Amino acid sequence: MTSMSHHRSLQAELETLTTEAFRPELAEIDQLPTLEIARLMNGEDATVPAAVAARLPQIAAAIDAVADRMARGGRLVYAGAGTAGRLGVLDASECPPTFNTDPSEVVGLIAGGPSAMVTSIEGAEDSKELAAGDLAGLGLTADDTVVGVSASGRTPYAIGAVEYARARGALTVGLSCNADSALAAAADHGIEIVAGPELLTGSTRLKAGTAQKLVLNMLSTITMIRLGKTYGNLMVDVRASNEKLRARSRRIVALATGAADEEVERALAATDGEVKNAILTILGGVDGPTAARLLEESDGHLRAALAAAPR
């Protein structure tokens, strides 16, 4: 195939994608007052949650499968290029401080490596082999999950990641913003959030990016809920790595137990600042070492540990 014919083929393919569609009614948007453009953009953004809601059954099924793998010691790996890759890295980076996960448990891979977070790496997204190499470096196992993220659903890096992972028995999820995408078809679980054409033609950092962020929020957050990383809606596995989080830790213990400040401080001191353990010492009436043992025996699930505490 000649270079010119390849470009024509690619152009024809892109023209079929909802995320690339041109909207003639917005052709003079640059002539509008700033407030009117803001209203238009806000209205566009408001349609995204409904598009996500239409795929909640598929999202929930993927989450249950991910949680099952992670409960066996597996990892959650996001793989994408450009905005999609950055969103995966962002979600992965928030898990250690929020849920006290090891940085190796939830991983974000972006085509072109860490420098691609701030600089476009030419050609990186076009390589399936690059994705395979990145995943090979992680020593992928059958207990792991790989989530390929691509607004178009055709990005070779994301598809290559899913294909490589699936061939090795890992669970695969394909998150796209176009219907009938190659990415969703390549994965065990396809999630296609069709939010419609963008305000700026083809700028998928807008509605598509918002949709992807909402889904990734669900994937990581609900998986962690299933793994016992929360107690109700409290982040009991939060890592108190700064003063704000230390204050939050004290508040979480107080909210979960109703204990006074002095008792909260004693409980945290007796458990080396571990929120979940501190709650267990107060509600379960056990000492720090016993709390640690009960939580270990309950795979970190606080409710199960409380049920097992001697009364």
UniProtKB/Swiss-Prot annotation:
As its record notes, the protein acts as a catalyst of: N-acetyl-D-muramate 6-phosphate + H2O = N-acetyl-D-glucosamine 6-phosphate + (R)-lactate
* InterPro entries found in the cross-reference section: Etherase_MurQ (IPR005488), Glucokinase_regulatory_CS (IPR005486), MURQ/GCKR (IPR040190), SIS_dom (IPR001347), SIS_dom_sf (IPR046348)
In this chain the SIS domain maps to: 66-229
Query: CDD domains given for it?
Result: SIS_Etherase (cd05007)
Q: Where is the active site?
A: E94, E125
Question: Gene3D superfamilies annotated for this entry?
Answer: 1.10.8.1080, Glucose-6-phosphate isomerase like protein, domain 1
Q: Which GO terms fall under biological process for this protein?
A: amino sugar catabolic process; N-acetylmuramic acid catabolic process; peptidoglycan turnover
SUPFAM superfamilies, per database record = SIS domain (SSF53697)
Q: Which GO terms describe its molecular function?
A: carbohydrate derivative binding; carbon-oxygen lyase activity; ether hydrolase activity
Please indicate which superkingdom the organism of origin belongs to.
Bacteria
Q: What is its EC number?
A: 4.2.1.126
Q: Which pathway features in its UniProt record?
A: Amino-sugar metabolism; N-acetylmuramate degradation
Keywords assigned: Carbohydrate metabolism, Lyase
Q: What does the record note on quaternary structure?
A: Homodimer.
Q: What else is known?
A: A lyase-type mechanism (elimination/hydration) is suggested for the cleavage of the lactyl ether bond of MurNAc 6-phosphate, with the formation of an alpha,beta-unsaturated aldehyde intermediate with (E)-stereochemistry, followed by the syn addition of water to give product.
Its annotated function is as follows: Specifically catalyzes the cleavage of the D-lactyl ether substituent of MurNAc 6-phosphate, producing GlcNAc 6-phosphate and D-lactate.
Q: Which family does it belong to?
A: Belongs to the GCKR-like family. MurNAc-6-P etherase subfamily.
Q: What's the name of the protein?
A: N-acetylmuramic acid 6-phosphate etherase
The species is Streptomyces avermitilis (strain ATCC 31267 / DSM 46492 / JCM 5070 / NBRC 14893 / NCIMB 12804 / NRRL 8165 / MA-4680)
Taxonomic lineage from the root: Bacteria, Bacillati, Actinomycetota, Actinomycetes, Kitasatosporales
